[in-house]
Amino acid sequence: MEKLIVAEIVVTPIGTTKTGLSDYIAKALDEIKRAGVKYQLHPMGTVFEAADLETAFKITKACHQAVIKAGAKRVLTTLRLDERLDQPRTMEERVKRVMAKVK
């Protein structure tokens, strides 16, 4: 059976000279786009789909390094993984199933 990993990544540059982080986040998002995976940016992070753990880790590393390359002196990266083995469910399917139950 095909599996699908849904990952949420939050890359936070620390000790930058300005309060806005969009320049750094855009660099990380460029790496996710370059990987060619489906993703959704939200106000507090980014969710993406990966075929396997190696791909999820590779994307996470690329995002982390992109923020360092953009000038961050310290970076805090948080990764949450949901690997469902019985039935692959896309990001959209997961949201749709919950919203169908909201009254």
Residue map of PLM features:
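Charge-rich, low-complexity N-terminal segments
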Residues: 1-103
